[in-house]
Amino acid sequence: MDITEKLRLITRNAEEVVTEEELRQLIETKEKPRAYVGYEPSGEIHLGHMMTVQKLMDLQEAGFEIIVLLADIHAYLNEKGTFEEIAEVADYNKKVFIALGLDESRAKFVLGSEYQLSRDYVLDVLKMARITTLNRARRSMDEVSRRKEDPMVSQMIYPLMQALDIAHLGVDLAVGGIDQRKIHMLARENLPRLGYSSPVCLHTPILVGLDGQKMSSSKGNYISVRDPPEEVERKIRKAYCPAGVVEENPILDIAKYHILPRFGKIVVERDAKFGGDVEYASFEELAEDFKSGQLHPLDLKIAVAKYLNMLLEDARKRLGVSV
C-alpha cells in the first residue's frame, strides 16, 4: 500500500486530522507508527463506540500498531462505578472490540491503572497542572463529563491525564471522537512544554442517535452489539429518517460509517414495480438518490437493518450471545 492509499484509508470518514501534513510525514518516516484510542469501560458497546473501532481497523490495515487504553482510572474519576465494577466491564469491552474485528495480534490492550499510578506519571500530572489554567481544564472536560454542573476536582484532573496518556503510551497518533478535540489540543500545546512530542490527532464524527438527537445511554437511542436481530430491526424501523433529509439522518449515517466501509456496497432490495433492486458503491450515490426521493426511507431502513445484522452476527457469535 503506497502513501496515498494509506492516507485515503486513514482519513476515510474522519471529521478532522490535526494535521494532515504531519500525518503524511509520520507515515513517510516511521515504519510502524503507533496509534491509540482510550475508552472508559462501558457496559454497552454500541454503534458510537464502533466508529473508533472501525478507524482502528483502518489504521491496522495501513500498518499502524494499535494501543487500546481501557481507562479504568478515568472511568472512576468520571463517576462510572467502583474499581471492581469497572475492571469487570473493561474485560468485557476487550472481548467485544476483538469480536468486532480488531486484530488482537496487532493490538495491545492496556489498563490505565497499569501505569497511571507510577511515580513518573503522577509527577507529570502535577507538572501539567502547573501549566494548565482551571478554565482550560474545565473547557476540555465539558464535552465528556458526566457531571456538567458543579463538577468535582477529579474531573479537572481527567483531561490532564488523558493528554499525558499520549506521551506515556508512546503513541504518535491520538484517535477519538470530535468531542475529544479540546483535550487533544491541550495535549498538542502542553506536552512539548514537558519535553514530549506533540501528537497527530484524528477525530471521528459523533454518530447521531436513532431519534435524531445526541446519542445517550439514558435515552436508549442506540443499537448495542448485544441487541438481537429482531431488536435491531425494530429500532431501525422506528428510527428518525425523514424522506429527502440527508443531514443528521441516523440511518444514512449507519450506512456511511458502518456498512459501506465493511461491505464496500449496499444493495437495496425492492419489488420491480418500485424500480427493482439498486446497488450503491458510494455514500454519495446513496445520499443523492435518497435526497431526490428515488429511494424511499422504508426501503433504506430494511436494507440497513439487514446489513447491520450481518455485521454484528460474527461479533454476537464470538461473544456467545444467543439470538
Curated annotation (Swiss-Prot):
<dbReference type="InterPro" id="IPR001412">
    <property type="entry name" value="aa-tRNA-synth_I_CS"/>
</dbReference>
<feature type="short sequence motif" description="'KMSKS' region">
    <location>
        <begin position="214"/>
        <end position="218"/>
    </location>
</feature>
<comment type="function">
    <text>Catalyzes the attachment of tyrosine to tRNA(Tyr) in a two-step reaction: tyrosine is first activated by ATP to form Tyr-AMP and then transferred to the acceptor end of tRNA(Tyr).</text>
</comment>
<keyword id="KW-0067">ATP-binding</keyword>
<dbReference type="InterPro" id="IPR050489">
    <property type="entry name" value="Tyr-tRNA_synthase"/>
</dbReference>
<dbReference type="InterPro" id="IPR023617">
    <property type="entry name" value="Tyr-tRNA-ligase_arc/euk-type"/>
</dbReference>
<dbReference type="InterPro" id="IPR023684">
    <property type="entry name" value="Tyr-tRNA-ligase_3"/>
</dbReference>
<feature type="binding site">
    <location>
        <position position="180"/>
    </location>
    <ligand>
        <name>L-tyrosine</name>
    </ligand>
</feature>
<dbReference type="GO" id="GO:0004831">
    <property type="term" value="F:tyrosine-tRNA ligase activity"/>
</dbReference>
<feature type="binding site">
    <location>
        <position position="36"/>
    </location>
    <ligand>
        <name>L-tyrosine</name>
    </ligand>
</feature>
<keyword id="KW-0030">Aminoacyl-tRNA synthetase</keyword>
<dbReference type="Pfam" id="PF00579">
    <property type="entry name" value="tRNA-synt_1b"/>
</dbReference>
<feature type="binding site">
    <location>
        <position position="162"/>
    </location>
    <ligand>
        <name>L-tyrosine</name>
    </ligand>
</feature>
<feature type="binding site">
    <location>
        <position position="165"/>
    </location>
    <ligand>
        <name>L-tyrosine</name>
    </ligand>
</feature>
<feature type="binding site">
    <location>
        <position position="217"/>
    </location>
    <ligand>
        <name>ATP</name>
    </ligand>
</feature>
<dbReference type="GO" id="GO:0005737">
    <property type="term" value="C:cytoplasm"/>
</dbReference>
<keyword id="KW-0648">Protein biosynthesis</keyword>
<comment type="subunit">
    <text>Homodimer.</text>
</comment>
<comment type="similarity">
    <text>Belongs to the class-I aminoacyl-tRNA synthetase family. TyrS type 3 subfamily.</text>
</comment>
<dbReference type="GO" id="GO:0005524">
    <property type="term" value="F:ATP binding"/>
</dbReference>
<keyword id="KW-0963">Cytoplasm</keyword>
<dbReference type="InterPro" id="IPR002305">
    <property type="entry name" value="aa-tRNA-synth_Ic"/>
</dbReference>
<keyword id="KW-0547">Nucleotide-binding</keyword>
<feature type="binding site">
    <location>
        <position position="158"/>
    </location>
    <ligand>
        <name>L-tyrosine</name>
    </ligand>
</feature>
<feature type="short sequence motif" description="'HIGH' region">
    <location>
        <begin position="41"/>
        <end position="49"/>
    </location>
</feature>
<dbReference type="InterPro" id="IPR014729">
    <property type="entry name" value="Rossmann-like_a/b/a_fold"/>
</dbReference>
<keyword id="KW-0436">Ligase</keyword>
<dbReference type="GO" id="GO:0006437">
    <property type="term" value="P:tyrosyl-tRNA aminoacylation"/>
</dbReference>
<dbReference type="InterPro" id="IPR002307">
    <property type="entry name" value="Tyr-tRNA-ligase"/>
</dbReference>
<protein>
    <recommendedName>
        <fullName>Tyrosine--tRNA ligase</fullName>
        <ecNumber>6.1.1.1</ecNumber>
    </recommendedName>
</protein>
